[in-house]
Amino acid sequence: MEMVTIVKANALAKIAGNEVWIVVTDAKSPPIRPLDGVHLVDLDVNYYTDYYGLKGFYKKNRLHKERLEKLLNEIKPDVVVATGKHEKNFFSSLRLPSKPLLIREMHFEKHYRKKIKNITLRQKVSDWMATQYDYHWKIKGYDHIVILTEEDKERNWKGRKNVLVMPNPITSKCEEVSTCEKKTAITMGRLVPLKDFSSLIRIWGRVAEKHPDWRLEIWGKGELEAALHQQIKESGLEGKVCLMGYTAEPLKKMSQASMYLLSSQSEGLPLVLIEAMSVGLPLVSYMCPTGPRDIIEDGQNGYLVAVGDEKTFAERVCQLIEDEPLRKQMGQAGLEESEKYRIEDIAQRWMQLFRELLAKKSSRRNSR
């Protein structure tokens, strides 16, 4: 989320007439990417130090509200976009005489918590309450809600006129494009249950029976690393499925593969699929909610597979392995499709959205 926010802020700041601010609560370290013409304000609330427990959290939340309210009344912005961190607890109750346009960004599919396997009843109840809090109780004071995919809007926000769709942009660029000739498939992400890499390892077991000279690279770190290592060993896939660890150059690694695979149970908008397209990779993905359906046109730039259908997933991978011209054709189609996620285009779409929403808000005020 931090990377996407910085990339969008930098792009918006380059547009004539804009003044852009990023407000944070505890800037413990420099931004992960340099800011270009963007004001950075640290409210110095530091939620995770000094105070512990519920009482401490409420004190921090009150301090956060006071400092944010004071800042916004000083700079008097036309538009305020909340990303849904701690400010969601009080944002709609801020006293702002200048009446800016209040927008809430939602970065996750509404029911993503339900997709996590092997959780206790207590966790399920807690997750249900968190979903009600995030998606019902605390969004009523915003002028508009911005979500990532048309699929999410159709599934979870039907009939809500103030819900709009805006995809995230590609946050990095790579000059190298895949030749789609190397005998390597690739996937990336945190090694956590939601990404379901264990399913992908089982899928690759099927693939390896027909194509033992191909291998799968899994890039990322996380809590399931030891368990996945054990699964690979027990499946006899050592050397055919490789846990590669962390990389600071994900697009470069993608450009050295021939297809991208996604096995997640849930996503918001899987940026990795867009990044993979941007280096010319064909895609094979579960049709998890949400995102893959917005990105992949089945049979054109990749394949969509029902979640859990490991047999069909393996068949689609084998189809790409066995048909190099098809791999290259789909990779080229994805490369062209990725153009609409360029940050320059996304920034202009945000500007058009701001203009339209501000004009409507002004019209409503004048008609009173």
Predicted regions and their residues:
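Conserved acidic donor-binding segment of nucleotide-sugar-dependent glycosyltransferases
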Residues: 297-299, 303-310, 318-324, 339
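Short His-centered aromatic/hydrophobic patch
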Residues: 82-88, 106
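Membrane-proximal helix-turn-helix segments that form the acceptor-binding/catalytic region
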Residues: 69-70, 124-144
